[in-house]
From Swiss-Prot:
Ca(2+) 1 binds at D83, D85, S87, T89, E94. InterPro entries: EF-hand-dom_pair, EF_Hand_1_Ca_BS, EF_hand_dom. Homodimer. Interacts with GCA and RYR2. Interacts with ANXA7. GO terms for cellular component: membrane; sarcoplasmic reticulum membrane. The lineage of its organism: Eukaryota, Metazoa, Chordata, Craniata, Vertebrata. Calcium-binding protein that modulates excitation-contraction coupling in the heart. Contributes to calcium homeostasis in the sarcoplasmic reticulum in the heart. Modulates the activity of RYR2 calcium channels. SUPFAM superfamilies: EF-hand. This is Sorcin. This protein is encoded by an amplified gene in multidrug-resistant cells. Detected in myocardium. One of its GO terms (molecular function) is calcium ion binding.
Amino acid sequence: MAYPGHPGAGGGYYPGGYGGAPGGPSFPGQTQDPLYGYFASVAGQDGQIDADELQRCLTQSGIAGGYKPFNLETCRLMVSMLDRDMSGTMGFNEFKELWAVLNGWRQHFISFDSDRSGTVDPQELQKALTTMGFRLNPQTVNSIAKRYSTSGKITFDDYIACCVKLRALTDSFRRRDSAQQGMVNFSYDDFIQCVMTV
């Protein structure tokens, strides 16, 4: 079974692979990366940032454009999406991966915000998810739209939170679906860990 955003998915949206070395101290040339200044301005001595620092970093960078800056819960989701070592932080390489994904999702959001209201409606969300390779039944899309909308509209921050959660849960599911059949068996603890860490 091909998963959205992964090689062989057809219609996947995420650029590149999901691999990436964990962050850490800078390496030669890293300080020349234009993103490093944003990252280094909030990172501690360990070269890692947590959700609070990520929120400050993304706000300073202006990646949200004219949209409201990301709230802390969305930043927690972003960290958890790339937190492969379960440290609650991300290094510079993970930050760069996040930056690329966020830029792609922002462009995607803009392309589906046809009336330029700064929001997407549930029908636009369904089209967006379909073009990202998610094949979800209408009831699932309806549940997602209800979870992330306010008065029937989904803001940029909520759209990003939705994309982050879908990617993280899909990645978690894919790791457990070794036969790629679209079905897995979870122990209760494994299931709780999967959904509570996203």
